[in-house]
Amino acid sequence: MANFSKPANMMTMIFSFFALLQFTAALGHGNHHHARRNADAAIQEQVEEVAHHLNKRAIGPFVAISGVCSTGTVWWGDCDSNGRQSYPRLEIRQLRQNGDQWNLYLLGMERFMNKDKGDRLGYYQIAGIHGRPFVSWNGFPTPLVNQAGFCPHGQTLFGSWHRPYLAIFEQAWYLAVTEVINDFPENQRQRWRNAASTLRMPYWDWAQDPGAGQPTVPTLIRDQQVSVTKPQGQVTIANPLYSYSWGNSLPNEMGGGPWNNNPFTLRRPVANPTRSNNNEMNGRFDAMRISLRDRVFALFSSKQSWGYATTAQIGVRTDLSGSGVDSFESVHDAIHNTAGGDSGGHMYFLDVSSFDPIFWLHHTNVDRLMNMYQYIVPDSWVANGNINRPMAQWNEGEAKNGGTPLKPFTKSTYGDYFSSGDVRESRVFGYYYPETSDRSYSQVAQAVTRLYGGGSRTLNKRDEPVNEKTGQYLGRPLEEGDYHHVLDITADKYAMDGSYTVHCFIGNGGNTTHSNSTAPYGNSTTPASSAYSSTPTPPASPYKNGTGEVLEDYDPSKDFTQSPDYVGAYGILGGMKAGGGNASYPVITRGSLPLTTCLQGKQYYGELKSLKPEDVEPYLQKNMYYKVIGVNGELDPSTIPNFHVAVRCTKVKPATSEYELPDLSAPYELLPKATENKPAGKPFTYTPSPIDIPLPDASYGENGNGGHYDNNNGGNGGNGGNGGNGGNGGNNGGNGKPGTSYPNTGVFPYPTLPWQEQGYCASVQTIKYVYPDGKAAGY
């Protein structure tokens, strides 16, 4: 009889083995689900905690501005300098790749924009902080110090003031995002909480190469409608990035607006019916992208201090400081002018620009660039300077520095204001940028070279090194012996109603249509008189599918910027009215357009021998042209008050490794013959007005810590004045009065010293959020 005992035992073993496998798989599956549930619960707790704390910070007379952050186990809050719960703000095209986050971003913007105009955390009120309607916000005392907006453009606080401004925008928008999540059924909310947990508002990098065949201005910003997922399913809504609407009419408190008080924001508008021309806007940005790239790269290579590189204010930054000839603020102005357009769109006017959604994408990018620059010059920060025009929170002539309260932005519900020292680290507001994740010079330097270094794009041997859309030369890396050339522009910020733009060309064009223009290109602009008297009529042309744009609105063949000879646009951003709110002196700014890439192209094609000054100067004298266009059409450069142009150059010191940047720092050599026969191009020496000159550094310390002024009539018992006749402070000086050499024409009183302003704080503070019940966040 056969013995089956061994096979039976074997079958038992096999069965047991498979049972064990099943059990192990089930256990693993269960553990996986358990871990997943734990992760989901943690994310739910995080998002709900953020919403809870942001809502608490909105209670009381003052909003505690924190950006997108909550509290954790540390008492000072978890959005501190160590980066707890800080996440990157992404470029808009990168954010779009995450469908759920993109959906939440749009729905949050829609909810945010639709909030009541009386809601201080609604879009209308937060946009209104910047300029019009010139009203109080967040408990700021009324009446305002002056009938003006709060934004310090053309001032040393430009960069640091906009950081908490963006933070309160992001905070209010994120609150709207959390409200949107709660609209979804409970069984769908976890999906959206997961998306929201790392979501921050995006930026639009207008200087990066968008890639072959891609537009500089993404259609994400230009499409009139967009498809989103709501609780009821897939729906089409008005794109919240396309425009903002005030409703049926512009509120009276706005005091008027472009295009006959048009009740929605416009970009490069045309009439009949009144509408945006986003196709032309994209065409202009395509043509100026290389210039924007070069300006950004040159700024990072300028080695200026952060305070000088971030403001266009001339007295602080250039002639008096000996620094370079451009600033992030000057670059920023060109984006405003190009997006709004000389036909009078909202971005074209400083006091209404913040209502266009593109403003926030643009300013977030400016904050990004200035944040990156902090790692290039880590030992410098806000520069000292004077308020050069009446503002909502300050009088003209007041001296300011890094301890100045950034009104109206409060860090507690008790009304304590942020200072520039408080906002130096972006992570206190819960964000950073992809290029600053390591907080290192080398990371930023590599990113700058990759994104903005001329000629860094890889070309095939058969490729021409030119822009496929405009024919402009793309550039090559800077080499030993090269010179960097710029068109240096000095301008009066508020010389006229609206803004104005300088367009520069190098080459030979056709016949000019304007006898006072230096550019041989016809004027293709629309006179802005139409911007204030448009009469809507039925559309004359069919709309392009999906965008709301009229096909005939933009013809690239008639756009003078679509030329291989086009260098770029330099913008002077003004307000709806000339004069800068009754400023006593012209508000003079300075910046530049790099000419180097275009000159490299002329050398590449054999039109220019070299980039040495002796070859470039006569070439530009013959072949460089520029035209200036304002809201009323083309302008004669020689008639614009305080407008001057010059060509300057500096010898390049190439980068020594991939972790370094080249040196394009000052001094710059003047090439006078390049412009002396052109309008506004004669040699010019800047003479500072009294308000342009910052007080000596010693003047910014608190009384009693040393002589405050430049002779021994200043100070109040200090221990050492540093100027004049070398006095030792002295007890006979007036408290708060400058020495006799400080310019004073009697137009304003002696300046208020920074430390005399209520809320001044010179130290770098720890952010501590305090609620109305007196408890600190996290207790």
Please identify what each model-predicted range represents.
Residues N712-G734:
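Long, low-complexity Q/N-rich tracts
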Residues L27-D710, G733-Y779:
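C-terminal accessory segments of proteins
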Residues M1-S5:
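N-terminal secretory signal peptides that target proteins for export/translocation
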